[in-house]
């Protein structure tokens, strides 16, 4: 996983959309039943209608109910590492543009902050001293304001992975790290994703070498789990590499076999032509070699066989 916060959170939300909404927008997630489906809106679907500046941080998710009990709902999720880069006006423009593009008023904007946004407004109101003509607000999730101790045993994988980003006393740093690792082990069974999100935990935990040594001493089970993640991921990678290598080797072998078969067939055809020329004409070896593409030595050997 690259050390790009925007991409890290995009991957996280796209891999676990329900759990992401449960953590980042619990007031909305409370109304989602098990039948709802999550569909990420690809950037390709938006580029023709929206400016590229809208596509850097935003993650649109379309929520639908197959039985039609509720109208589709569009979530717009932004992640900001630097609160200073957040613009509520930009989010409002983007939300309105998506509403127009998808012909819906059912849009829920959500912003996830990795640092406390001291100056980021929670809403904007356009109007004058007499009337408000446009009011826009959004759901804001400030990770460092969430109490990490409340999520130590959470069944929500997104919450467990984000424990290092939450608020906790310094003495709990390694316990927070260990809980995130245990959550990854118990809540995600895919080895590829285990390795992928172990890196996510490491990026945000900021464990130095001394702390890692203490962690390995005090949390041996979790340290062994981390080693197991990496080893299984590497073993699967080697197995995939071996299978791909065998397949490529087989394909190359078949291709080479066909080439060799064609070469043998062509050579046998040249020998047959040379034999006919020897039997039916007085041509010498050099002339036959020129006409058939055989070497003079091959022509002479063929002539010797005919004589025998």
Which sequence ranges carry the predicted segments?
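Elongated, amphipathic alpha-helical interaction scaffolds
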Residues: 1-308
């Amino acid at each position: 996983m690259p050390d790009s916060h925007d991409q890290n959170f995009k991957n996280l939300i796209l891999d676990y959309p329900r759990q992401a909404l449960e953590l980042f927008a619990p007031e909305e997630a409370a109304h989602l039943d098990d039948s709802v489906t999550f569909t990420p809106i690809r950037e390709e679907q938006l580029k023709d209608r929206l400016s590229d500046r809208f596509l850097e941080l935003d993650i649109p998710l379309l929520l639908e109910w197959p039985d039609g009990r509720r109208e589709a709902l569009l979530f717009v999720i932004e992640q900001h590492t630097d609160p200073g880069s957040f613009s509520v006006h930009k989010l409002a423009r983007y939300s309105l543009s998506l509403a127009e593009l998808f012909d819906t008023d059912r849009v829920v904007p959500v912003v996830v902050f990795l640092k406390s946004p001291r100056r980021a407004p929670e809403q904007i109101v356009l109007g004058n001293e007499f009337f408000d003509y446009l009011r826009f607000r959004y759901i804001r999730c400030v990770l460092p304001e969430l109490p990490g101790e409340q999520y130590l045993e959470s069944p929500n994988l997104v919450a467990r992975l984000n424990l290092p980003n939450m608020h906790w006393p310094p003495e709990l740093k390694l316990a927070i790290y260990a809980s995130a690792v245990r959550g990854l082990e118990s809540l995600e069974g895919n080895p590829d994703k285990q390795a992928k999100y172990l890196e996510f935990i490491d990026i945000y935990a900021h464990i130095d070498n001394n702390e890692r040594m203490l962690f390995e001493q005090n949390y041996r089970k979790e340290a062994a789990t981390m080693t197991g993640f990496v080893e299984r991921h590497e073993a699967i990678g080697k197995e995939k590499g071996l299978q791909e290598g065998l397949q490529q080797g087989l394909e190359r072998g078949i291709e080479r076999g066909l080439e060799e078969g064609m070469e043998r067939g062509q050579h046998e055809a040249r020998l047959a032509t040379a034999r006919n020329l020897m039997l039916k004409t007085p041509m010498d070896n050099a002339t036959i070699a020129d006409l058939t593409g055989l070497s003079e030595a091959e022509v002479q050997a063929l002539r010797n066989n005919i004589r025998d």
